[in-house]
């Protein structure tokens, strides 16, 4: 009798697993344990604040690439890495860094500082190889300030290890779904955002298929509570000309019982704030998840113990559904 009971339970579980839709399989793979692991590594003191062009951000890039490879995500090109250089023409330290495919050649006589950086780019090829969706977040932060007396490391747990964790989990969720998307979907990790959106700007400047990108989904700071009375509050920016982006989230929250409380902010010209600006300026529709500022913004006190893990997981699930729509919906 016991054998029959065990067999019945096994058959039932097998049926339930088989009955799950690809989207549900992807959602099920998103969890707090992974968020804690990814953010914990990226925001560790050993990464020295992940300043673009320096050791910590290079370690972060290698870590992210190794995870993409382990998941089975292909590199976008011959490598997961897209190297680029930024330059500063002014002699003063405060001079703005610039990026251009031929920047050093063009401004060679005027360059007084050069930084070498790397974006990390992976792709799941779609059935329709002529269209793209991109999911991205910046991997860099502010590094170290030796002038500070106590904590000198800007760990950047919320800004933006939290966003990187979401992109990684979404990439894994697409693999877990077991279904090839209709469009190519790129998973992008930008370097140099804190120095002027350098990595995303370089990508857009050099992208041969920019007009074929149907949408860009951005994450920048998704782990804190700026409204204690609303712990699941999140700001949801999206291109106003694409009302489907707002409709999707409203429908998905209801359908999948997500506990987010979005502040919907359609934006007629979303060219500021984060890496979404690089794409919006090129005419690409955008979505941007953001949980607003807080007292630890751009401070050494931006640590993992202050994150709302439940919110990070819920945002990641909601945004996976956004990405699924970007990659699979015929029209929007």
Model regions: which residues?
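Bacterial Sec-dependent N-terminal signal peptides
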Residues: 1-22
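Metal-dependent peptidase/peptidase-like ectodomains
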Residues: 190-291
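Structural recognition of the beta-strand scaffold that forms the well-ordered cores
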Residues: 39-43, 82, 119-121, 132-136, ...
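Alpha-helical metal-binding/catalytic segments enriched in His/Glu/Asp
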Residues: 120-122, 131, 135-141, 145-196, ...
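N-terminal capping segment at the start of a domain
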Residues: 22-24, 29-59, 71-81, 85, ...
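A non-catalytic alpha/beta surface segment that caps or lines the substrate-entry region
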Residues: 50-123
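Second-shell loop/turn segments in exported
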Residues: 22-29, 45-55, 70, 106-111, ...
């Amino acid at each position: 009798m016991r054998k029959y009971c065990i067999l019945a339970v096994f058959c039932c579980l097998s049926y339930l697993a088989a009955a799950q839709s690809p989207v549900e399989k992807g959602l099920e793979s998103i969890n707090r344990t992974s968020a804690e692991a990814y953010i914990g590594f990226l925001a560790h003191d050993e990464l020295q604040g992940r300043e673009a062009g320096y050791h910590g951000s290079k370690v972060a890039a290698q870590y992210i690439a190794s995870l993409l490879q382990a998941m089975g995500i292909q590199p976008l090109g011959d490598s997961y890495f897209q190297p680029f250089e930024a330059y500063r023409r002014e002699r003063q330290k405060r001079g703005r860094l610039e990026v251009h495919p031929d920047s050093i050649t063009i401004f060679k006589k005027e360059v007084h500082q050069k930084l070498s950086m790397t974006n990390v780019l992976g792709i799941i090829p779609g059935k329709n190889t002529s269209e793209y969706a991109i999911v991205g977040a910046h991997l860099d932060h502010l590094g170290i300030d030796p002038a500070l007396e106590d904590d000198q490391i800007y760990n950047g747990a919320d800004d933006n290890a939290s966003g990187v964790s979401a992109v990684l989990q979404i990439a894994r969720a697409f693999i877990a779904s077991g279904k090839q998307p209709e469009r190519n979907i790129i998973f992008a990790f930008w370097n140099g955002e804190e120095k002027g959106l350098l990595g995303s700007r370089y990508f857009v400047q050099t992208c041969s298929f920019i007009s074929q990108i149907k949408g860009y989904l951005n994450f920048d700071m998704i782990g804190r509570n700026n409204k204690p009375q609303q712990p699941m509050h999140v700001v949801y920016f999206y291109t106003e000309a694409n009302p489907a982006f707002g409709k999707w989230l409203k429908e998905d929250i209801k359908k999948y019982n997500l506990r987010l409380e979005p502040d919907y902010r359609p934006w007629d010209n979303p060219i500021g704030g984060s890496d979404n600006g690089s794409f919006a300026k090129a005419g690409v529709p955008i979505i941007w998840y953001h949980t607003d500022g807080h007292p630890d913004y751009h401070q050494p006190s931006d640590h993992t113990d202050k994150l709302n893990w439940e919110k990070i997981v819920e945002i990641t699930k909601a945004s996976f559904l956004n990405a699924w729509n970007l990659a699979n919906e015929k029209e929007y």
